[in-house]
């Protein structure tokens, strides 16, 4: 009888410890927002989770609430295809470019797609790289899109808008176009380089998808973004390579990193 009671006691103790651990970790779990197809309401829901106020492109931190958004459409032709995009364009000191984000890639560079009346004669929606893309890629906000060139990876780091002071954010989300296969889309890191989690975007062949993650606190120092399983190219379609590009970026108001 004593042996049975001891075993039962140990079982209950282990169960209580497991529940306690789950309770502690549960509060740290981020909110994940996903959608595909008609994603307008999904995107707006994500904005609301970040505070619902677009803090625009003014320098300085606007407090712990609100978000910054980039839709790429304000860029001039000189900064769009067939030309490369300046990685620090939205990390400028002055409005409206003071949005506190720096982009980098291990590839050849970054590119924003041409609009339909650009002076270079470049096809829109990355048709300058592969003419098929102009018909395949859709836009969420007209009419420019964003992608790395020579790689399918982009790293995002954050700054207090208008300064070179490193920052952290509560979350980051973005619109994908033409996601055909399951793959890790975002991996979030804190300022010590620890992974905060990997997340996949929903599928939407020739359509739009959205993935956004929100943490309880501003923890995100860097985000690694994967654009499909391969880089854009003139021979896309050969093999099992799935390419995808992006439209709007939405991220929490950057807060000074400790």
What are these regions (language model features)?
Residues 2-11:
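Bacterial N-terminal signal peptides that target proteins for export
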Residues 25-258:
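Surface-exposed, well-ordered secondary-structure segments
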Residues 17-20:
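C-terminal motif of bacterial Sec signal peptides marking the signal peptidase cleavage site
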């Amino acid at each position: 009888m004593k042996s049975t009671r001891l075993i039962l006691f140990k079982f209950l103790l282990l169960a209580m410890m497991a529940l306690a651990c789950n309770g502690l970790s549960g509060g740290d779990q981020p909110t994940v927002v996903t959608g595909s197809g008609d994603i307008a309401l999904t995107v707006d829901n994500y904005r609301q989770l970040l505070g619902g106020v677009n803090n625009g492109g003014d320098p300085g931190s606007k407090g712990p609430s609100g978000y910054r958004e980039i839709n790429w459409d304000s860029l001039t032709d000189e900064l769009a295809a067939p030309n490369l995009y300046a990685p620090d364009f939205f990390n400028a000191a002055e409005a409206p470019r003071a949005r506190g984000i720096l982009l980098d890639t291990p590839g050849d560079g970054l590119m924003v797609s041409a609009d339909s009346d650009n002076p270079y004669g470049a096809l829109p929606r990355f048709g300058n790289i592969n003419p098929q893309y102009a018909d395949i890629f859709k836009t969420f906000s007209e009419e420019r899109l964003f992608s790395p060139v020579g790689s399918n990876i982009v790293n995002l780091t954050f700054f207090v808008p208008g300064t070179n002071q490193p920052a952290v954010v509560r979350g980051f989300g973005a619109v994908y176009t033409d996601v055909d296969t399951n793959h890790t889309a975002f991996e979030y890191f804190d300022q010590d380089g620890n992974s905060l989690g990997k997340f996949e975007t929903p599928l939407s062949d020739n359509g739009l998808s959205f993935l956004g993650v929100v943490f309880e606190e501003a923890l995100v120092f860097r985000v690694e973004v994967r654009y499909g399983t391969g880089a854009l190219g003139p021979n896309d379609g050969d093999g099992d390579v799935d390419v995808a590009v992006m439209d709007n970026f939405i991220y929490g108001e950057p807060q000074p990193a400790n």
